[in-house]
């Protein structure tokens, strides 16, 4: 067994900026690597969130830009779509900027699951109300259809979130 000196490599020098090896090309981590999860936007969960946000935005724009007389029904639809869009964007940013590592007091998979359960139920109700009150106006019908599409995408997120939560919990219990 040898207790001799070994080579220790670090990404930053302990001396000045012009210390030993300052001119050499050393592989270093980018400053955004710790802050941003650059692989997250390519995951299925992120693409699903983007699809949800796009369909919710289209549904909101369709209803907002068309003429309607039943203010309570479509105001409810607008509020639900925008609130759902904002919450999905918030969860997207939490995963993109890795806020879940900083805010460990929150169970992020559980909070995302609860958000999707409540948001999907409210979105389904809003889409049904919007479809029943559309009066054959094309913008309102399109908004209701995109609302149902967003509901389907949110159901897919519930399944994915539930699957991740249960698999994570069951493997933790087995260990």
From Swiss-Prot:
Q: State the membrane topology.
A: Multi-pass membrane protein
Q: In what residue span(s) does the MARVEL domain sit? A: 40-166
Which compartment or compartments is the protein found in? Membrane
Task: State one molecular function term (GO).
Answer: cytokine activity
Which InterPro entries is this protein grouped with? Answer: Marvel (IPR008253), MARVEL-CKLF_proteins (IPR050578)
What are the recorded Gene Ontology BP terms? Answer: B-1a B cell differentiation; chemotaxis
Q: What is its main location?
A: membrane
| Segments passing through the bilayer | 43-63, 77-97, 110-130, 140-160
- In the UniProt record, which is one GO cellular component term? membrane
Keywords, A to Z?
Chemotaxis, Cytokine, Membrane, Transmembrane, Transmembrane helix
Q: Which Pfam families match?
A: MARVEL (PF01284)
- Report, as the record phrases it, the tissue specificity of this protein: Highly expressed in leukocytes.
Supply the PROSITE patterns for this chain: MARVEL (PS51225)
State the family named in the UniProt similarity comment for this chain: Belongs to the chemokine-like factor family.
Name assigned to this protein: CKLF-like MARVEL transmembrane domain-containing protein 7
Tell me the organism's taxonomic lineage: Eukaryota, Metazoa, Chordata, Craniata, Vertebrata
């Amino acid at each position: 067994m040898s207790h001799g000196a070994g080579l220790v490599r670090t990404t930053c020098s302990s001396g000045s900026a012009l210390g030993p090896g300052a001119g050499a090309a050393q592989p270093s981590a980018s400053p955004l690597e710790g802050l941003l999860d650059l692989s997250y936007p390519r995951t299925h969960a992120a693409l699903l969130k983007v699809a949800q946000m796009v369909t919710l935005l289209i549904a909101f724009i369709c209803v907002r830009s068309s003429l309607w007389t039943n203010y309570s029904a479509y105001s409810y639809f607008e509020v639900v779509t925008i609130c759902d869009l904002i919450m999905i964007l918030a969860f997207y940013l939490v995963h993109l900027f890795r806020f879940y590592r900083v805010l460990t007091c929150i169970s992020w998979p559980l909070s995302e699951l609860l958000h999707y359960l409540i948001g999907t139920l409210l979105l389904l109700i809003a889409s049904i109300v919007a479809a029943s009150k559309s009066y054959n106006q094309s913008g309102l019908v399109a908004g209701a259809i995109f609302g149902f599409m967003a509901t389907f995408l949110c159901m897919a997120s519930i399944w994915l979130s539930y699957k991740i939560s249960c698999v994570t919990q069951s493997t933790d219990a087995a260990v």
